């Protein structure tokens, strides 16, 4: 069974990811690139291949009432993909209205699947 460790603590959490985890889950904060660099250093210390660790993120999907935030969401996801993230999971704002899900299915998911 694969092991995923979530969190961004530099001394303990990311060290444990480098040592034991098959995947990690990080928040898409402005510090995420730095946290990935810390993880790389821990991997070097433990002689672990950094690229073997799957990088995932928690993400808040607020597409807007009419999809006005789609472009911004897609660009953020593209940036995370370029950093090595393979999956984004999270909640869709106002999901009970169904329209946000339709927008996600029509615009966000196909765009993200292309990178």
Residue positions per predicted region:
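Active-site-adjacent structural elements that line small-molecule/cofactor binding pockets in enzymes
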Residues: 1-115
